[in-house]
């Protein structure tokens, strides 16, 4: 509905990042108060809905507007609401955040024990992974210290001057970022004897706990900047999304920049090109 209309308009007008941000901030599309009354005419809260592959995804989306769904459906009970609560717990685990006592109580209260059983298994696996992460090496969390926004990026890369750098602007919630990180593991192993360092920069939209539990599997130098610093980097370097990659040669020159993972072959080619300069 609303999102599709706005996205289509943004794409058709080919707006740049700043215009897009201003558009989404200032454009208000008013819908009639009864616009979503049609929801009560759909079968959204029956066990038969579980046969639809998209139902779990939809329940997850609806869980963020539980108040609206209660109003339109006239109830807060049923499979849709159960799945919504379970989905929120699942997303927590997916974000490397173990279930809280409150979340466990929510699962305990659900009519079907299946939710608790399945999510307890996933939660236990996560807890074991977190313990194993404490023993892992190959990654380092770096503190930036107090610097101006103008000095931020130069401060980050200065201690690594003289090496070829692959700088990855990413986020823990970014699926393509996470897939790319896994895809590059064999490449990094292949190039381990080359003079290449990997720098990962993320912002506060990556929850600190999630970030700390995710990076042990991402070998390299890690930085987590503030929202203000992140916004400055995005604006200064005209970064429109994540992941965005910079290849920087030993002299500090940016030899390659791309938003979106270009694939390991291209990445390796660009790194080797920078090494030979």
Regions found by a protein language model. Name each.
Residues 1-161:
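Oxidative protein folding and maturation machinery
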Residues 136-139, 150-156, 163, 177, ...:
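Hydrophobic, well-ordered secondary-structure segments
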Residues 150, 154, 185-188, 208, ...:
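Extracytoplasmic/secreted envelope proteins and their assembly/folding machinery
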Residues 163-165, 169-173, 241:
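Short pre-active-site segment immediately N-terminal to redox-active cysteine/selenocysteine motifs
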Residues 163-164, 181-201, 269, 273-274:
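Conserved helix-turn-beta segment immediately C-terminal to the redox Cys motif
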Residues 169-186:
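Conserved redox-active cysteine motifs that mediate thiol-disulfide chemistry
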Residues 189-230, 235, 239-242:
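Conserved segment of the thioredoxin-like fold in thiol-based oxidoreductases
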Residues 228-272:
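Thiol/disulfide oxidoreductase modules built on the thioredoxin-like
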């Amino acid at each position: 509905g609303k999102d599709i209309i706005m996205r289509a308009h943004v794409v058709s007008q080919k707006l740049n990042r700043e215009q897009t941000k201003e558009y989404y901030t200032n454009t208000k599309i008013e819908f009639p108060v009864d616009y979503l009354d049609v929801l009560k005419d759909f079968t959204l809260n029956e066990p038969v809905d579980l046969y639809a592959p998209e139902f779990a995804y939809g329940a997850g989306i609806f869980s963020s507007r539980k108040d609206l769904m209660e109003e339109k459906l006239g109830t807060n009970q049923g499979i849709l609401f159960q799945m919504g609560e379970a989905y929120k717990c699942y997303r927590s685990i997916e974000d490397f955040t173990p279930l809280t006592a409150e979340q466990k109580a929510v699962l305990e209260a659900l009519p079907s024990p299946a939710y608790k059983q399945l999510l307890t298994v996933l939660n236990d696996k996560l807890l074991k992974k977190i313990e194993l992460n404490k023993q892992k090496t190959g990654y380092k969390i770096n503190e930036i210290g107090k610097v101006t926004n103008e000095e931020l990026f130069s401060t980050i890369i200065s201690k690594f001057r003289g090496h070829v750098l692959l700088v990855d602007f990413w986020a823990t919630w970014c699926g393509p970022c996470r897939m790319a990180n896994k895809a590059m593991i064999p490449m990094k192993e292949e190039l381990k004897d080359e003079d290449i360092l990997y720098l990962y920069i993320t912002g506060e939209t990556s929850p600190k706990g999630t970030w700390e539990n995710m990076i042990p599997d991402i070998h390299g130098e890690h930085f987590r900047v503030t929202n203000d610093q992140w916004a400055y980097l995005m604006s200064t370097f005209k970064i429109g999304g994540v992941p965005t990659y910079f290849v920087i040669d030993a002299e500090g020159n940016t030899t390659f920049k791309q938003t979106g993972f270009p694939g390991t072959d291209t990445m390796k080619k660009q790194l080797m090109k920078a090494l030979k300069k």
